[in-house]
Amino acid sequence: MQSEIKTIAYANGEIQKVQIVRWDRWEQLEFLTPEQAPEALDRFAAIYRNYLVPAAPWIFGHMVLFQLPEDFAVDLPGNTRKHGTVASSLTAAAAVLQEGVSVRDSKPVFRNEAAKELWLALERQNCIRIVSGRLPTTKIIPVTNLPGYLSEAAPEAALKVNSSFFIMDCFDCASVYDHVGTPFGLCVKDGRVIYPPLYNREALLVDRNRSASIRHLNVTDLEIEINGHLFRHGKNASIYSRPEKLWAPGGKKKYLIITGCQVTAVSEHPTKIPASGFVLFPWEDAEIPAGSPVIYHGLEEIVFGIQVGNSILKDGVRTEGFHSRFYNIRHLEPVPFPPSLYPMDFEKARAARIALGADEHGKPVLLWAEGAAKIGYIPGKGSCGASLKEMAELCEQAGMKHTVNLDGGGSAQILIRNQRMLQISDRDALTLAQSERPIPFGLVVR
């Protein structure tokens, strides 16, 4: 494995640091789930409080972030009228709070006893936070127990890097089935789909011949197996997904709400489609309970695949615009690039960036463009961050041929033998020290 650091000096005095990492085989690259970080709830609340809300306080209301501790003792309804039969206690809790609580003057106002009991139990275990913008609305934001620190996972690994997009801002939480910290977008390893493709975005795929390519993929392209039943969109089932649809219509037959590789809920009622998944409607009756595992077929020849951001290079040619689909989940307006709340300019908007791709020999290459500190940035002292156009130039100069963006911004980091050679862009509001963001999913070369 080879790693090099480059510093680019611009005429206006700004600088940009870049790390390029190369290794031999895609088979060495695996997906990694960090151990849960106990303080993840506080970190996400701080991200809302320090970065998201100050950027546009007029579009945020009162946001209630909460987690369920493992030993949580409050009984939660598994069957809800509005959201169907749910598999997850976190989803059930979100439904209770959504139906029964609002926030005024940073304090809860309860509409029923179930919501009050749940809120007080979460308070006793220090598992609920309120972050407020200027609007009078209330948004319930469940936080999974998945996110952890990449620096604390697999400390002996040769390489670690963040990877997938995950539900993070409140507008990503489009339904009670969407939880902060849930990864989404295709992840496939040795033919097994870990997370399905969504939104028909571009994916980097490496087949068993070690040939890399980039192509658009959606969940409708795959065959879906649940409890021995095989479903294909347009053949014996209908799939409803965003951004084309906000709701699945409901009816006499049951709908399956799916996130990742699980049936999250089963419902006969009109159902809000999750941003992190989709809704499947079998044309024939099938007894499939909530919690059933989901298997995806159609990518068995793929050694490694990932679907995150827009392509950067295709067949050695720079991507000059946005080829993947992104949208503002709040109004379903097309936007050029994530985050879904703040549209970004392809040529001018700079941030920390991570790119993964293959060189002309098909070997993996990783590139990190260090981002500007979100608090306390001094031009010429720290990196300014890269636009997507600049990222394409950097990747081309590094000899990459097929390349996609991974999750960037405050999540972006590479660790070699558990050492970070560049700086992450999130900063502690008091000390200005680097502040690592919890993430649910990463990549590792052991």
Q: What is the predicted role of each segment?
A:
Residues 1-446:
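Gly/Ser/Thr/Pro-rich low-complexity, intrinsically disordered segments
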